[in-house]
Amino acid sequence: MGDITNYAIPFFALTLLLELGISIYGKRKYYTNKDTWASLIMGVGSIGTTLLMKGFKFGIFTVLYSFKAVDIPMVGWGLVALLLADDFTAYWVHRTSHRVRYFWASHVVHHSSTHYNLSTALRQTWTGELSGSFWFYAWMPLVGFPPIWILTAGSVSLIYQYWIHTEAIKTLPSPIEFIFNTPSHHRVHHSRDVKYLDKNYGAILIVWDRIFGTFINEEDHPEYGLVENIDTYNPLRIAFAEWGVILKDVWIAPGFFTKLKYVFAPPGYSHDGSRKTTDQLQAEARLKKVAEQSGKL
């Protein structure tokens, strides 16, 4: 148990090659060489930092587990509860990673590709665990989930999320689309289109988005990437670009609280209006739509 993602590497490789073949022979342009290599290098680097933090994280969870409220058996209902607890937490980690710039600085890596394919799933942060995102899961050992099983559930979630990074699958039967995260739902999440920004955070289940008001169906075909793309294939720049911009913003920002906002406010925050957050961009889009509709009356 624990990190079982290594066992999935052959599956990752085979399916990536299959999708690449579909892209080449179907002339669908899912892949470009530089983008794919950048994604793969980011994935390898992520494995290194994840392994570096694995023992530390397991140690923290083990200490917390010694104060557990109850013993949750890892059979039957206990396994179901584990997966639901992990998925619920993953939703909020993901949502926070889009709404708090400190965490976005790591997560932005995963959204930095302007393509959407299985290699994009492997484009992972080098700083996510180092930034302390694992603390969101600290409640689970305190409740009574064994640490090794918490790590296992996280691996299961990552493996599930791999296959939804594809354009080769359009939509699935409606009951599946209603309950689970699917390629269609996740394509929306990777879009840079204003109406799609900060939507569909779900990991395995999409029901959390439906419950908490962050769900949107795929309508128009998404344009992938960031609101302002970083336009580089350099792995070091991909990994650390946003951290560098944060440091620059903090350095030049006037006043202590403004400096804090550049770290912890939503991405796009600026004290002088030079940049815009998702909320601001979407508010402008709504006003523009209302104005256009009014002009037609």
Predicted feature residues:
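Short, hydrophobic transmembrane alpha-helix segments
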Residues: M1-D3, Y25, L64-F67
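Cytosolic/stromal cytosol-facing helical appendages immediately following the last transmembrane segment
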Residues: T5, H115-T120, T166-L297
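Membrane-embedded catalytic scaffold of the fatty acid hydroxylase/desaturase
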Residues: V44-M53, K68, I72-Y224
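Membrane-helix exit/interface motif
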Residues: G55-L64, K68
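Hydrophobic transmembrane alpha-helical segments in integral membrane proteins
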Residues: M1-F12
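Central hydrophobic cores of alpha-helical transmembrane segments in multi-pass inner-membrane proteins
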Residues: F11-S23, K57-F58, L83-T89
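Membrane-interface helix-loop junction between the first two transmembrane segments
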Residues: L17-A38
